[in-house]
Amino acid sequence: MSTDTKAAQLANEYFQVKRHGDMAVLVPSPEVEHLPDTTINTAAQMVLAPLKEDPPTNLIVDLTGVRYFGSAFIAFLLRCHLPVKQQGGELVLAGVNDRVRELLKTTALDTLWALYTTRQEAMDALGGSD
């Protein structure tokens, strides 16, 4: 199996991307918190490729199933942020639990991204619907 095929499988297994017009919702699986950094980076490249080709105006990252994450996932979020910002849009986080909220506050990333309790709240704030 080629490296690209493995990367695509990882991306499909650990990340779902759903388009809603010019808005996208990225849903990492709960298992993403247990992945080694190199695996997150590999899967992230596959997830980001279509987003870079056709950047959404706004991107919601729904963290509902994710209890915590490390620096590799933060780097992934930052890489997702750039193409969206270049389009004049926003990356926002939904389904943020208290532990993740505290991590984002400690790193001051809560000032970069708006945090919402639910995906629907985020979609409403960005002018979309589910």
Regions found by a protein language model. Give the residues of each.
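General small-molecule cofactor/ligand-binding pocket signal
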Residues: K18, A94, Y116
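Generic signature of intrinsically disordered, low-complexity, basic-rich segments
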Residues: T3, Y68-S71, E121
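Short acidic-hydrophobic, aromatic-tinged amphipathic segments that line or gate anion-handling sites
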Residues: L112-T118, A122
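STAS-typified acidic loop motif
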Residues: Q9-Q45
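A short, charged, amphipathic alpha-helix used as a generic interaction element across diverse proteins
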Residues: L126-D130
